[in-house]
Regions:
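Class I S-adenosyl-L-methionine-dependent methyltransferase catalytic core
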Residues: 1-207
Length: 207
């Protein structure tokens, strides 16, 4: 089945209530809505302050944007983008538990423009690039925020940079541990870079 046609099925950190992990959407039409996420090793939602900084950077770019969230996890970035007016968000998640909650959030928020796909980022990128067709919508904005300890960022960044999935000028958000080195694809130029505690994050543009 095509990755483009699959069924859509603090630094202030996430709060905990009733034994569940929670975060909140901080801007847009769903501002204040809370999202549960499972306790899974490596699942670390982008905190409120970093998200606020990121979406301030993107204020002029989000409305109408076609977004890709490669390591969706809690859905913090994908649903935040939709809340603020993005046209669509394709959200990739490998964990079955996280995927099920993302689907539940989509239904609860009535987020019909969220496409949630249960696979790995690498598998999706390889298949999507192979099946990409001219005239298909490009991605304007890509979020890449994998589990820090698994060293997935560099491999998936290289796959994405060599893909057909976005256009010159597309923006890429990267998040990683501040102690991690990263060899960026030569096609990406830095726009904004910042650090908050043990998290380094930045916005890059496809040349």
């Amino acid at each position: 089945m095509s990755p483009f046609s699959k069924r859509r099925s603090s630094q202030r950190g996430p709060s905990q209530g009733d034994g569940r992990n929670q975060l909140r959407i901080i801007g847009g039409k769903w501002r204040g809505r809370k999202l549960d996420f499972p306790k899974i090793e490596g699942l670390r939602p982008t905190g409120d302050r970093i998200r606020e900084t990121l979406f301030n950077w993107l204020a002029a770019e989000i409305p109408g944007a076609n977004c890709l969230d490669l390591f969706s996890g809690s859905g913090a970035l994908g649903f935040e983008a939709l809340s603020r007016g993005a046209s669509k968000a394709v959200m990739i998640e490998h964990s079955a538990k996280a995927y099920q909650l993302l689907c539940a959030h989509r239904e609860r928020l009535n987020a019909e423009n969220a496409e949630i796909i249960h696979t790995t980022a690498e598998q999706w990128l390889l298949q999507a690039n192979h099946e990409f067709q001219n005239g298909q919508d490009y991605f304007d904005l890509v979020f890449i925020d994998p589990p820090f300890q698994l060293n997935w960022l560099e491999r998936n960044s290289a796959l994405l940079a060599d893909s057909k999935l976005f256009h010159p000028g597309s923006l890429i958000y990267l998040e990683q541990g501040s102690d991690q080195g990263l060899k960026l694809p030569p096609k990406w130029r830095p726009i904004k870079q910042k650090q908050a505690g043990q998290v380094a994050y930045g916005l890059y543009q496809q040349a």
